[in-house]
C-alpha cells in the first residue's frame, strides 16, 4: 500500500540505480506519488537530509496490476495471488507460489475489523511473513472504538474539543465514519479534506 513505511525507499532505490519494475494495485499506484511528495516535504521541513534528489522522487513509477492478476510480467514460474487486506485503499496481502519451491504468504498491514474496507480471507502458505505492529495489544478494535467514543462523548459533554491526529486514509476515514455514526447529530465533526475524500 501507499503509506510511507512501505514506499519511502522507492526514490532511494532509483538513486542507487534501480530501474526495474515496481508493481502494486491500481489504487496504490495512483496514491504513491502524492504520499511520497508529502513525506519528502515533511522530512525536509523537519531538517532531514534525504538520500535522494528531486529527480529521483519525480521519476518513481509504479505499474498497476489488476486485482485478478496471477502472472507477473517477466517472472516465469511464479504465480501471484492477492486479496484486500482492509488496511487502506489498495492494500493487499500477497501469496507467491513457485513451481518448484512452494509458497509464501505476506500479509502486509491488515485490518480485519475495519468498518469501511473489507479484508479477503487469507489463503494458506508454506511460509509466512506476518505484520505484527499491534501484536502486544490485546484490546479488540470494537473495544478500542467504544472507549474512544466514551472519551469523546465525555469531553464534548464538558464543552471540550477532541483532536484525533490520524492518517488521512484507512484508519482515519474509518474513525470519522464511526464517530459520525455514533455521536449525536448536534456534535460538529471537522476533518482534514484528505480524510473526507478517502
How would you label these PLM feature ranges?
Residues 3-7, 12-188:
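His/Asp/Glu-rich metal-coordinating catalytic cores
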Residues 190-198:
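Long, charge-dense
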